[in-house]
Amino acid sequence: MSWGTELWDQFDNLEKHTQWGIDILEKYIKFVKERTEIELSYAKQLRNLSKKYQPKKNSKEEEEYKYTACKAFLSTLNELNDYAGQHEVISENMTSQITVDLVRYVQELKQERKSNFHDGRKAQQHIETCWKQLESSKRRFERDCKEADRAQQYFEKMDADINVTKADVEKARQQAQMRQQMAEDSKADYSLILQRFNQEQWEYYHTHIPNIFQKIQEMEERRIVRIGESMKTYAEVDRQVIPIIGKCLDGIVKAAESIDQKNDSQLVVEAYKSGFEPPGDIEFEDYTQPMKRTVSDNSLSSSKEGKPELKFGGKSRGKLWPFIKKNKLMTLLTSPHQPPPPPPASASPSAVPNGPQSPKQQKEPLSHRFNEFMTSKPKIHCFRSLKRGLSLKLGVTPEDFSNFPPEQRRKKLQQKVDDLNKEIQKETDQRDAITKMKDVYLKNPQMGDPASLDHKLAEVTQNIEKLRLEAHKFEAWLAEVEGRLPARSEQARRQSGLYDGQTHQTVTNCAQDRESPDGSYTEEQSQESEHKVLATDFDDEFDDEEPLPAIGTCKALYTFEGQNEGTISVVEGETLSVIEEDKGDGWTRIRRNEDEEGYVPTSYVEVYLDKNAKGS
């Protein structure tokens, strides 16, 4: 099968077909280019995804990756990054092995096609020229023959006419002979050109066109083979990265299999273990005995040994004690200390605080009661610890990590000691290196001045001394913590509320069990334990008592947001219960729905005191 013999008359169609083949090849190149762009975009998105979920340095997330599940996730992210790299390899290989080669091949193919069809058109033009020459000689021969016939007929006519002179007859005869000769010459020329054309036409259809079409056929077949090879390469590029992608997936599976739930559980224990013992049982208090009730064993009141006893004046302790349940102490400590805000500019004249309808109540101000409570010496140390604990909530971490539970504090101190030892070792190595260099300079003065190293050596030595002092300080704290951790029976006993006749030990060790020598443990997860020394002591005494009774009502004149601790928000026109009158500091204590209470500016409410409350 040959296009030269089978398609000898389909020159134009072959030209269109070969152009279509080049278009198909360019279309495939465009497809591969778009595939490479997709692979690059996909790889970029995968890398961004992996980077997005990587733990941030020096953040809490980085600490979370000590758990095996988080480590496995981190390994998954790293494997995903390698997975993305393989898609980049696919893109690069497709570009270098397919796109670049095909683009170059298309240019060569276009040039070869152009050359072949140029030769074909040239041969076609040549045969057309020969055909035109043949037609021209044929027409000339035909014309000369007709002219010769007319000249012969004219001569015969003149020769038959007796009236024509002999000279005219001779002239007609010569003209007929000339025309006859011209016809013979045209015939010979036509015969020669016809013979030549037939030769050219045979060569055109049996030699030139078959050769040209054969080249075009070979060119087209090479194009088809090349596009097939490119498709194979396309598949092989993908196949080459499959083993590596499989390794990435195997890495993810291996990371998943490395997850150890027991190990993670142990890490949680190590991270959050406080070192405290759980509280013991609470002793039954018999209220049927006709005796004066005392506060619970681990409260801050005086012991049976005659130590000063905390007095709460007034008829009702619930009325005088400004705390309720778990938040009793915190309510006292977080009550507003700043002056109340002034009322809005549209204050009505009727809203006059502390007017005739608000006589002064016969009770000591809350601040006076708190000061009296604080002056009890056995309690001062406990409250000082609590005060330090509350100050730590501002975000300042003590140097000795006293805001951490004992177990966590020990780990922090141990880590600090290890870090300092590493720094000491680093500085020591540097000092040794400088000393050796100085010895070299002393032996070989031409290499350097030994005195130039004295300043650096003194600086490094000073740094070592500072670090050693720092390490010694933390080691002392660490030894103190490690020495206290085993002694937990007394601590549990103190937390349980058992009264053993040693209240002075409770008071003395109140802060020591809850704090380090320079601060108290006040982390949010253990805030309740932090003030159990206070809150637990008083909960037994006051949990069963009724809330402070209402001494009147009030109507909100303006809306108050109540954003500070100890305050409560009110809405204009709202009616609430008054449980404590203004003591001269500009704040009135109110209650809503028997469970919400707090302070509002006296100028924001209109107070109506009960007559019975005024007289009490």
Curated annotation (Swiss-Prot):
It is found in: Cytoplasm, Cell cortex; Cytoplasm; Cytoplasmic vesicle; Lysosome. Residues 552-609 are annotated as: Interaction with FASLG. Residues 552-608 are annotated as: Interaction with DNM2 and WASL. Residues 403-480 form the REM-1 domain. Residues 549-616 are annotated as: Interaction with ARHGAP17, DAAM1, DIAPH1 and DIAPH2. GO terms for molecular function: identical protein binding; lipid binding. Residues 67-259, 398-490 form a coiled coil. One of its GO terms (cellular component) is cytoplasmic vesicle. The modification N6-acetyllysine is found at residues 66, 110. InterPro entries: AH/BAR_dom_sf, F_BAR, FCH_dom, FNBP1_F-BAR, FNBP1_SH3, HR1_rho-bd, SH3-like_dom_sf, SH3_domain. Residues 534-616 are annotated as: Interaction with DNM1 and DNM3. GO terms for biological process: cell differentiation; endocytosis; nervous system development; signal transduction. Highly expressed in brain and lung. Expressed at lower levels in colon, heart, kidney, liver, small intestine, spleen, testis and thymus. Isoform 1 and isoform 2 are the major isoforms in brain while isoform 5 and isoform 6 are the major isoforms in lung, spleen, testis and thymus. The record marks 166 as: Mediates end-to-end attachment of dimers. Residues 1-264 form the F-BAR domain. Residues 399-551 are annotated as: Interaction with RND2. Residues 549-610 form the SH3 domain. Residues 1-79, 251-616 are annotated as: Required for self-association and induction of membrane tubulation. Pfam families: FCH, SH3_1. Residues 502-511 have a biased composition (Polar residues). Residues 494-616 are annotated as: Interaction with PDE6G. Keywords: Acetylation, Cell membrane, Coated pit, Coiled coil, Cytoplasm, Cytoplasmic vesicle, Cytoskeleton, Developmental protein, Differentiation, Endocytosis, Lipid-binding, Lysosome, Membrane, Neurogenesis, Phosphoprotein, SH3 domain. Residues 1-334 are annotated as: Interaction with microtubules. The F-BAR domain binds the phospholipid membrane with its concave surface. The end-to-end polymerization of dimers of these domains provides a curved surface that fits best membranes with around 600 A diameter, and may drive tubulation. Homodimerizes, the dimers can polymerize end-to-end to form filamentous structures. Interacts with AKAP9, ARHGAP17, DAAM1, DIAPH1, DIAPH2, DNM1, DNM2, DNM3, FASLG/FASL, and SNX2. May interact with TNKS. Interacts specifically with GTP-bound RND2 and CDC42. Interacts with PDE6G, WASL/N-WASP and microtubules. This is Formin-binding protein 1. It comes from Rattus norvegicus.
